[in-house]
């Protein structure tokens, strides 16, 4: 995925605010052996780009000053309530340097699993992306996970996922987060309290005389 960036000379809160007013988003490119570069990107183009899954987990081709740079999105700061990107960070990609990146997870087969089809269970996607470690050339666009074998009482953890070659899950020590949980659906039974009738009240109603009819007008 490609995008165009421009070098910017000024930095600081005031300069960034003025830049946003003109429809530009300030950013930075860092990493590798080169010095960090301050950049600016057209906000409209950036706003459309961030809506695409590939912009968040794939190697991006950034055109800067007529030169193409391979980068990864590292941070995205949004305005608290406006539809505005306040600042964006990219990291340079070096072919021989192993990287840690977040990759989206695509689930399938859930509706055909015994857990859903016959065991009346609720399947919850606890994590929808996975942090992996690999070389830039091996970064997958997404990780496919088949949930067709899920059964009642069985959860799927990060270390259960079969990853592509040369790609490893980036988890620390014995940590093994749950990716998918399976919970039995418990149907709540609402008990209706029986209506208690007072015998005396019922007898009184039965013996009550009907109301007298009004006299006819002459």
Curated annotation (Swiss-Prot):
Top-rank taxon of the source lineage equals Bacteria
Gene Ontology terms: cellular component? cytosolic large ribosomal subunit
- Entry keyword Signal: no
Matching InterPro entries, A to Z?
Rbsml_bL25/Gln-tRNA_synth_N, Ribosomal_bL25/Gln-tRNA_synth, Ribosomal_bL25_b-dom, Ribosomal_bL25_C, Ribosomal_bL25_long, Ribosomal_bL25_short, Ribosomal_L25_dom, Ribosomal_uL5_bac-type
Could you identify this protein by its name?
Answer: Large ribosomal subunit protein bL25
Mention one GO biological process in which this protein takes part, according to its record: translation
The record's keywords, sorted A to Z, are:
Ribonucleoprotein, Ribosomal protein, RNA-binding, rRNA-binding
Question: Would I find Ribonucleoprotein among this entry's keywords?
Answer: yes
* Complex formation: Part of the 50S ribosomal subunit; part of the 5S rRNA/L5/L18/L25 subcomplex. Contacts the 5S rRNA. Binds to the 5S rRNA independently of L5 and L18.
Q: Which SUPFAM superfamilies match?
A: Ribosomal protein L25-like
Molecular-function GO terms, alphabetical: 5S rRNA binding; structural constituent of ribosome
């Amino acid at each position: 995925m490609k995008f165009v960036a421009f070098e910017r000379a000024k930095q600081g809160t005031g300069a960034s605010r003025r830049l946003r007013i003109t429809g530009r988003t300030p950013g930075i490119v860092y990493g590798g052996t080169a010095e960090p570069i301050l950049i600016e990107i057209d906000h409209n183009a950036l706003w459309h780009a961030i809506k695409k899954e590939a912009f968040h987990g794939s190697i991006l081709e950034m055109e800067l000053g007529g030169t193409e740079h391979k980068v990864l999105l590292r941070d995205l700061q949004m305005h608290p309530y406006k539809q505005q990107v306040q600042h964006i960070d990219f990291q340079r990609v070096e072919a021989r340097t192993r990287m840690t990146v977040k990759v989206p997870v695509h689930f399938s087969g859930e509706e055909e699993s015994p857990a859903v089809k016959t065991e009346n269970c609720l399947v919850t996607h606890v994590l929808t992306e996975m942090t992996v470690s690999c070389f830039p050339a091996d970064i997958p666009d997404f990780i496919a996970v088949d949930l067709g074998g899920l059964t009642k009482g069985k959860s799927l953890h990060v270390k259960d996922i079969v990853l592509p070659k040369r790609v490893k899950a980036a988890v620390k020590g014995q940590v093994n987060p749950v990716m998918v949980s399976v919970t039995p659906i418990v149907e709540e039974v609402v008990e209706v309290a029986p209506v208690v009738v007072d015998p005396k009240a019922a007898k009184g109603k039965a013996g009550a005389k009907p109301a007298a009819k009004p006299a006819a007008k002459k």
